[in-house]
Amino acid sequence: MIFNLPVSVLLYFSLIWAMEPSFVRGKNVVNLITFKDSNGKLHKRLAPEEIPPRLHNSQVNSYPLGYKGMRDFSRPAVNLDDILGTQQRKQQEFLAELSPLSLESKLSLVNEVQIFASYVRNDVETYNKVSDPNEDLIIIAPTNRAVSQLTLKPWQFPNNIDKLESDGATEKELDTAIQENISKFVRSHIVVYNDDKNSYKKVSPGCTLLQSIDFTESKKSDSETGGDILLKKEGEVYYVASSRDEKFHAVESIENGSNGVILMVDFTLVGP
């Protein structure tokens, strides 16, 4: 049987077929949030992690591949062994001039952390740091599996979005709460490293306590010490833990960028 479909219909299905890969995230298939505006009218929108990169906020970064110029080579590269006071492996030595891509570009190339990367893109301030070649960052990037296994999606906590909706929150209030949740999740996994050692403290041989962006933003005063992320090295393996439970997880892979390093781990530092 031959179907003579209108050209418009054929184009529609061709477009859907072409877009399909960008909407499939394994367990995280396209999810729609239903909410009411101030007039009680129902709306639907894509969950933040399902929004195609750079479509959620076009002002985030206008540079291709996250490239924002050359790094000041007088700035030393982030070196985990310097932070830990451990012996450096030769294969981890980093030459910035051979790897000009920023961490934002590196994140986009690691398939195993694309859910986390999508959250980073939806936190404008942090995204710009990740894209800046003259920042020095340590990104603890949870795998897609780790994020998918959370009982709530990162945009749903700690602000209780369901409760806000049932209490009649406005669209603006919901957007603000969701953005706060996204920012807190992202910033709980990123450390802004500086060489004056304000961002880390050695707690034992080969083990260092780091301060995430979220931790530093939540501090009541600059004199407050401590941290929320533990990083250690045993033999040739790096491990990461939350300071809350001190349960260490092995770093599965390390990616070096012009402005820091990405440590891929199969767990999240914060949860519902």
UniProtKB/Swiss-Prot annotation:
Alphabetical UniProt keywords: Signal, Vacuole
Compartments (UniProt record): Vacuole
Signal sequence region: 1-26
Spans traversing the lipid bilayer: none
Identification of the protein by name: FAS1 domain-containing protein YDR262W
Keyword match ATP-binding: no
Entry-linked PANTHER family: FAS1 DOMAIN-CONTAINING PROTEIN YDR262W
Domain FAS1: 100-269
Organism of this sequence: Saccharomyces cerevisiae (strain ATCC 204508 / S288c)
GO cellular component, one term: fungal-type vacuole
Domain of life: Eukaryota
Misc note: Present with 4846 molecules/cell in log phase SD medium.
